[in-house]
């Protein structure tokens, strides 16, 4: 991809505004991923490699056993393949403990979780309107909100990382809503949190929902890491994942029409390349139609075959148990390295990565320098500045651990060449 973006080259005003705003932020990542030969170990991209041997075998069997001539046609169904929707319903009703049973009419499929969020924003917001995002938040929202829907993520700053899980976040939301320079239409959270990799407590989820009801906002809960929870005695609170689907909305005076949950196969099952996302909206038929219109033919029948096989598989409970065990072991391996070199980190138990505070990085420039030193050693990590954390919290990085054990060990060996001489 050319780095010369000085001239619009006949783009629409809308298209050029998006390119001009985003390319300077992502050109280095684009260049890195475009290399034909790349010996760097990527601990910056949140992908789960830990179940892939089992999943490869399961997906091969699915294609071998279940691929039929009909799968070469456009997918049937308005909001997704009917068999896939049934499998999703079975999955949500088993693992998300919904207060209201999930039915096929509540679902709309899309090619990935970000596509689900995009279709929600397209139907919730007009161009130029905003969505509240408590920081730190996943930096993919920065361009994912803007590319098609032209929606602005509105940072809600907090004094410390821990404040994300206290009542202080509600006060911060109220203040940001009051001073926002644009109309605010929704609040979005990732639960489990990205990049902090812990779960929100149920009482705080209820507070978020009441805040949205008070201000007539939509509530979007991105629950893409819902089943990537593992045991960690370092995490004293918020051990268990609680889905927004599980909350009795009527009992707290919240209209279910404003609540939307997003999930995909990407993280819990390590299938980010399959592009299989789904939105659950249980009491808003108009929204469900809008979501289906936006993405009803964009999911692959081949991916659907594999998803149906996996979600309905009798092996699913054991696969989830293996995933949790392997995540726990990988987390211990990485954090033992952190402890050895005095690297502080945010204790995690729900996700694929650790948010770690790099040593000798007290400014944004020093953070960038520390990231570049690791890159020079052959390890890519994701700099904390991109996640919009507190101004007082400089020098952080999100570091993936959900890779094959031998790859993680090699990454640690490379990182030791940096930290052993500091």
State where each predicted segment sits:
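N-terminal small-domain helix-loop-helix segment of the aminotransferase-like
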Residues: 4-112, 163, 168, 311-312, ...
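Short beta-strand
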Residues: 40-42, 262, 344-349
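PLP-dependent enzyme catalytic core of the Aspartate aminotransferase-like
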Residues: 90, 98-101, 254-255, 281, ...
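Conserved core of the PLP fold type I
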Residues: 69-214, 220, 226-253
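Conserved glycine-rich beta-strand-loop-beta hairpin in the small C-terminal domain of fold type I
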Residues: 324-335, 339, 344-358
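Conserved core segment of the aminotransferase class I/II
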Residues: 91, 246-325, 332-338, 413, ...
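Helix C-cap/helix->beta junction micro-motif
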Residues: 214-215, 341, 377, 422
